[in-house]
């Protein structure tokens, strides 16, 4: 049986998500799609939290990191989280075609 993790969101993740939501809703004029993306993101994070988040493949980075970054892919976006003791800390929400090495 795996340990239970608490969930924590960094302000940077919340900022990333808000910027994407605003872009889809206001620039692309598709608030329904923006809301669906938020819902899909919430569901994917909660699902990962309940399915032993350490059991998934980490993101391979050239940088030395104190904590491994794990990706969750949601449509054209990727959520990155780390595990710190009993906390799943959600750190970034980025467009999947961006250069992750410059963002995390």
Residue ranges, per PLM feature:
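Enriched for short, Lys/Arg-rich terminal
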Residues: 70-104
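Basic, Lys/Arg-enriched alpha-helical interface segments
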Residues: 1-65
